Curated annotation (Swiss-Prot):
EC category name: transferase
Organism: Oryza sativa subsp. indica
Taxonomic path: Eukaryota, Viridiplantae, Streptophyta, Embryophyta, Tracheophyta
Record keywords: Glycosyltransferase, Transferase
Protein name: UDP-glycosyltransferase CGT
Family in the record: Belongs to the UDP-glycosyltransferase family.
Gene that this sequence comes from: CGT
Amino acid sequence: MPSSGDAAGRRPHVVLIPSAGMGHLVPFGRLAVALSSGHGCDVSLVTVLPTVSTAESKHLDALFDAFPAVRRLDFELAPFDASEFPGADPFFLRFEAMRRSAPLLGPLLTGAGASALATDIALTSVVIPVAKEQGLPCHILFTASAAMLSLCAYFPTYLDANAGGGGGVGDVDIPGVYRIPKASIPQALHDPNHLFTRQFVANGRSLTSAAGILVNTFDALEPEAVAALQQGKVASGFPPVFAVGPLLPASNQAKDPQANYMEWLDAQPARSVVYVSFGSRKAISREQLRELAAGLEGSGHRFLWVVKSTVVDRDDAAELGELLDEGFLERVEKRGLVTKAWVDQEEVLKHESVALFVSHCGWNSVTEAAASGVPVLALPRFGDQRVNSGVVARAGLGVWADTWSWEGEAGVIGAEEISEKVKAAMADEALRMKAASLAEAAAKAVAGGGSSHRCLAEFARLCQGGTCRTN
């Protein structure tokens, strides 16, 4: 059993408790590897089986195979009746199932000999009380942007100040940061009775009880939000905030021997390929898929496109020919590769042939683009993605047409609009240079002595010394 860390010099044992979805699991895995390999910590990662998606299961298996120093703690959920929330998103349902099972974590943590915890924002309000009962400091790894963290921290105050107004959620002007327009607020938060809204508000109110908050960003990408959070401008009594990003992919995980996309990229000229992917979390309508296909074809550029047509990958049985217009694959076969297979996104973005990333702006995708110096054409669809797209535009990492529709709004983004934006971004040398400068800043941040490296070292030191607050 790993020993708890203390001031006598024993290695601290940090237990990481992620929630569901690749957007949450991936940064937790990267944090686990960073702490265990470079910051003198024993690390365990709590896993819940079965996972919601096949991608999650494969990711966890690869992580534990490649990094045996990261211990696996399997956690069995209490029975949960999903019929209480008819039609709810399967990942929100898993959040709720994990939240209701949180009291069962106590024996697992006792048996593991934990000295500190870091959990996901989706579980904050239910894991902090468990940690307190165990006498353990509980940090939060916030897997989205610092801008989104500031919204999460301030949103309960905003609701309290506007209670009884009857006007619903409008623009949210976050102290020390900037105004998040109504149109960029995650869709679910406009419904006070939505399952996600209840979770989001409860977790936001609990942030001040955390020992500290790690956020996967770096100063040059989000200077206003990071500074405001660290200076306590967003919410009173806020804990220390550690900007530890970009959390880098583990370098020795096995590659898929059957994948052919890297061979295809190797055959393309430098800075000629548009990489298109909308992540693992949400599907795009068939109508929008076909407009996107026509837009890519009309742009005249080479492209690698990863297509997803269902929320959960296990349900995705449709063939590419069913999803796209007849003849499309044949027309573009000499300059486009379209796949439904998993790709190593970080490997793709680092490839010299890739010049532009058409992205939903999930936060992992944004940080990977920044670390790789690849400009982004933002096409947000859901959740925090418009907030993240705003970060991309503010930082100069990419461009975003903020009038484009997203999930729940009428209309689709037309092929001609997409084509013109792709052509403009591919021709924008200033955009390319700014993205390259952000990659340099990201590399400096995570290198020894850099701001993110220092923050992660300080977090490990606090856990080692047992000085994290446990309020």
